C-alpha cells in the first residue's frame, strides 16, 4: 500500500511542477487536465503526509520513553497513546481512498420509476418517490428533466423516466435501484386499513456515444400518433417514437414532445443507457457470484427499502438501517441513507480486497 502511496505522491509533485511552468496556460485543455489530476490526488497525498508525520512523531516519542527526566517520559507516554490511536484510523482512511473508483460515478443518471403491485396506490407511491428524488436533486443543485411519463388516473405515475444532471449524480443514486415498498392507509381506503404496495426504481448512468456502440441496422424505429388520457390524440402529427434494439429486444417509447426528432433523441438516450446498464450488470454478475448479497446489487426483484407511514419509519433492508424521520426523507433529505449505503459498500469492497 505504501509503495503505491509513494508513487501517487511522486505523480502529485510532477503535476505541481508542470502547473508551475510559465507556459502552462497556452493549452487550456491540457491545463484543465493537469488541474483536475492535481485536485484528484490532493486529498490522498495530504492524508499520506499526515500518516507519515504521525508515524515519525510516534517513533520519536517512543525513544523519549527512556529519557531520564520523568516529566519528559510522562509527556512522551501521552503522545505515544495519541499517536497509536490515530495511526490505525489514518491507515483505514488511506485504504478506503485507494479503493478503485467507479468510472461511472461522475456520470449523470437516468432514473426510471414504475408502479408495482398495489394498483392506483402503487402509482401514487411512484409519484411520491419521483417527488422525493426531485427534492433531493434540488438540495444537491442538480437539474431534473422528464424524458417520458405515463400518468395514472389520480395523479400518480404508472411509469416516469427522467434525466438527472449534475456533480457526481450516479455516485449518490446508484444504490437506489430495486423494489421500494410502502405501508400506509390509502386516501381511498374508507375502513382505515393499512395497505402494502410497491414501486421499482432503475438507476442507470447516462450513456455517451463512446460508452455504447449502437448500429443503425440493429434498430427498428416505429413512428405513430401520440395519444393522451382517454385515447385522445395529443396532436395530429405522427410524433411519438418507439425504438426497438433487436439484439437485446430492448424497447423504448417516447411521446412527450410534439417534435418527432426530440422524441427520437430522448428515446435513443434512454436506450443507450439501458444497454450500458445491462452490459455492466452482466459483467458484475460474472465477476461476483455472490453479488446479490452485496450492497447495491440493483436487483429489481429485491425489496431494498420499506416506507412505513403510520410509524414514520424508513428501513433499508440491505444494511439493516432504520430511521424514524420518514417525513424528512420524503422531502428529499436522503443524505443519511446515501452515506450509510456508501460506507457499507466501502466496507464490502475492503473485505473483498483483503480476501484476494
Swiss-Prot record:
Keywords: Cytoplasm, Methylation, Protein biosynthesis. GO terms for cellular component: cytoplasm. PROSITE patterns: RF_PROK_I. InterPro entries: PCRF (IPR005139), Pep_chain_release_fac_I (IPR000352), Pep_chain_release_fac_I_sf (IPR045853), Prokaryotic/Mito_RF (IPR050057), RF-1 (IPR004373). It is found in: Cytoplasm. GO terms for molecular function: translation release factor activity, codon specific. The modification N5-methylglutamine is found at residue 232. Residues 281-301 are annotated as: Disordered. Its main location: cytoplasm. Methylated by PrmC. Methylation increases the termination efficiency of RF1. Disulfide bonds: none annotated. Belongs to the prokaryotic/mitochondrial release factor family. Peptide chain release factor 1 directs the termination of translation in response to the peptide chain termination codons UAG and UAA. This is Peptide chain release factor 1. The gene is prfA.
